[in-house]
Amino acid sequence: HALHVHHGLSRNADDWLGFCTRLCQEWNVPFRSVKVEVKKDGLGIEAAARKARYQAFSDDPSGIIALAHHQDDQIETFMLAAVRGGGIKALAAMPPWRKLDEETQIWRPLLTFSRKELESYAAACNLPNIEDESNADTAFLRNWMRYEALPVWRERIPNFDRHVCANIRSLQTD
């Protein structure tokens, strides 16, 4: 089934819920939505939303939650870990499989595909999608990394993505 976590943070949040509801009805996919309260509790808004979202995942009875993180997300996570610290575990970024709790596993099947590859596939297959407008806000460090820093690294260093991903794989297996 599909699970939509409604954070209520964007003025478009209700529209996203409607989009997911209609798409799942059209594709005959069982659908469930969970509205969460994002409590900052000393966290930034992104971290607080992630905490609420993962709690909703943990409460879902499906056992396996598949997420759409892709290679670009993985590279951003690695680079952010490099500048924030956190050691080897943080630099290993996101594993393809991770135990969330005793009953729930997180699965990231798209980590080997770039955002561009996924966008091309979606366009070729006429798959509808939505984009969270907050992803364009470079006030968030991850977005600044995505739109400002990483393009410079990619221009300067041949095969940058391939090298970073090789390091991530090495860190995950060590």
Sequence positions of predicted segments:
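Core alpha/beta nucleotide-donor-binding catalytic domains of modification enzymes
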Residues: 1-148
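ATP/NTP-dependent adenylation/nucleotidyl-transfer catalytic domains that generate, transfer
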Residues: 139-174
